[in-house]
Amino acid sequence: MEIIKRVTDSRKRTWECFVDRCYFDMYCVRVEGDRNFNSQLSFHFYTVNEAIDFMNLLKESH
């Protein structure tokens, strides 16, 4: 698994973005190290731009 980008939010959580080969090759954004398949902190996007935009929102949110 190749990490495309990492960001840290205001709660000091590190988020990672990668291509999820097991989920239709969609881009996944999740808390680093979270391996729970049913995690509420795992988000899938169709394009890398959508995933990066979401990560930027996470980084800027309070």
What are these regions (language model features)?
Residues 1-31:
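Short N-terminal "domain-start" leader segments
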